[in-house]
């Protein structure tokens, strides 16, 4: 064999192990990167907040009330947003008393005041305050988080 043939063969023999080492290093790096990526989502998944609980609504039948003003009538439908299901059950159990409290509250209203946005917001606050008191001594207060008008006619 000539010297040039030996040099070519030795150059090839150097390149083959070198390419094998580079390929193994690339595979090892890719495997490590993949493993690290799989470990990260578990820490991020724990950081997501839980979805908010479903709202609890309590729809009341509509009320028709004579106002203190002469010949004025209020027709109002109300739905209450409550804190929890226990409050809903308690209000349903004492529904006649709840309706009585609201009828008395509505009959004390002034038509001129109810015709404005501020008057309607004031009525919402009054409904929350009226229903917050315990229905029976020894029971907890009712937590009404919001009052929604479903019908509102002022004649």
Curated annotation (Swiss-Prot):
Coiled-coil parts of chain: none
GO BP term, pick one: chemotaxis
Keyword Hydrolase recorded: no
Keyword Magnesium: no
UniProt keywords, alphabetically: Cell inner membrane, Cell membrane, Chemotaxis, Flagellar rotation, Membrane, Transmembrane, Transmembrane helix
A Gene Ontology term for the protein's cellular component: plasma membrane
Transmembrane stretches, start-end: 13-35
Membrane topology note: Single-pass membrane protein
Subcellular location: Cell inner membrane
Cited InterPro entries: FliL (IPR005503)
Record Pfam families: FliL
PANTHER family xref list: FLAGELLAR PROTEIN FLIL (PTHR35091:SF2)
Function: Controls the rotational direction of flagella during chemotaxis.
Similarity annotation: Belongs to the FliL family.
The protein, known as: Flagellar protein FliL
């Amino acid at each position: 064999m000539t010297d040039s043939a030996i040099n070519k063969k030795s150059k090839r023999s150097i390149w083959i192990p070198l390419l094998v080492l580079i390929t193994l290093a690339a595979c090892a790096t890719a495997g490590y990167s993949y493993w690290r990526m799989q470990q990260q989502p578990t820490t991020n998944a724990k950081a997501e907040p839980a979805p908010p609980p479903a709202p609890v609504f309590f729809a009341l039948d509509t009320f028709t009330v004579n106002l203190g003003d002469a010949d004025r009538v209020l027709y109002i439908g109300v739905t209450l947003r409550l804190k929890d299901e226990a409050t809903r059950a308690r209000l349903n159990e004492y529904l006649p008393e709840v309706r009585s409290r609201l009828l008395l509250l509505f009959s004390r209203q002034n038509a001129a005041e109810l015709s404005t946005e501020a008057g309607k917001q004031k009525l919402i606050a009054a409904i929350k305050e009226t229903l917050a008191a315990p229905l029976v001594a020894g029971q907890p207060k009712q937590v009404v988080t919001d009052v929604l008008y479903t019908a509102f006619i002022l004649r």
